[in-house]
């Protein structure tokens, strides 16, 4: 036969019940003491009345008063009233305890709920912040990569395939820069072919200066080695550029190029 397992009682409730039972026991004890005190006080009063009515020399005290010797300590009602007040205080404390314990339990539960909600909100905020930071880093990296590739295309030319190299520069640009470069593409191609220019560009560093949803300004440090018919042979050239990169159809292209002194 399967045993039925009762769910464990709540620790907070068990403690509250124990405290309430202890309070009830103390109150009951106080009430018993008060009742005994009242009985002794009443016995003392009756004894005094009986003795007052009998002659001073009469030693025949009624038998019902023989057991009242222990009431000698109660000369008046002071002890009776003190005991009664003590019992009243115990009962009052017990009532306050019964009210206070559930109230404290409710406050503790409410505090726990508030703390849990606070931690949940904080965790959500941290996750959101992490997501935002990760997305921003990814976008910055994409803009920097677009600037890097555009500058490499601009500084890497070979007169043997000048048209293809110029077309690659146009393909990696957009907006104002693309329009200007495309207008001068034919003349630029002729200069490269006639001068027998061969350049190989390298981007050394990039840094995103500013960024919004669709574009970014990227600082680029680059070098190139130039060989031409004028006598240059792998001559190094240094370039410092400020490149505006714009997202266009999921691609990151140069839309403006400025030379920085």
Swiss-Prot record:
Gene Ontology CC: one annotated term: membrane
Naturally occurring in which organism (per UniProt): Mycobacterium tuberculosis (strain CDC 1551 / Oshkosh)
Family: To M.tuberculosis Rv1362c.
Membrane topology: Single-pass membrane protein
Origin superkingdom: Bacteria
Record keywords: Membrane, Transmembrane, Transmembrane helix
Region (Disordered): 1-22
Name of the protein described by the UniProt record: Uncharacterized protein MT1408
């Amino acid at each position: 036969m399967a045993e039925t397992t009762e769910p464990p009682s709540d620790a907070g409730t068990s403690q509250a019940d124990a405290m309430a039972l202890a309070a009830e026991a103390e109150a009951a004890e106080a009430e018993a003491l008060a009742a005994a005190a009242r009985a002794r006080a009443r016995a003392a009063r009756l004894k005094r009345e009986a003795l007052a009515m009998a002659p001073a020399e009469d030693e025949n005290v009624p038998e019902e008063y023989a057991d009242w010797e222990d009431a000698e300590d109660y000369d008046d009602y002071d002890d009776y009233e003190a005991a009664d007040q003590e019992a009243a205080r115990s009962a009052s404390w017990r009532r306050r305890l019964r009210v206070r314990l559930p109230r404290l339990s409710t406050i503790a539960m409410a505090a726990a709920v508030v703390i849990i909600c606070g931690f949940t909100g904080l965790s959500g905020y941290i996750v959101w912040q992490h997501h935002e930071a990760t997305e921003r880093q990814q976008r910055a990296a994409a803009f920097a990569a677009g600037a890097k590739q555009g500058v490499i295309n601009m500084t890497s030319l070979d007169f043997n395939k000048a048209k293809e190299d110029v077309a690659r520069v146009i393909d990696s640009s957009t907006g104002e820069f693309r329009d200007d470069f495309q207008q001068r593409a034919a003349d630029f191609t002729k200069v490269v072919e006639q001068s027998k220019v061969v350049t190989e560009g390298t981007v050394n560093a990039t840094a995103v200066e500013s960024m919004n949803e669709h574009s970014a300004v990227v600082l680029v440090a680059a070098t190139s080695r130039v060989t031409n018919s004028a006598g240059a042979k792998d001559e190094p050239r240094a370039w410092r550029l400020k490149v505006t990169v714009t997202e266009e159809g999921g691609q990151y292209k140069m839309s403006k190029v400025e030379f920085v002194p």
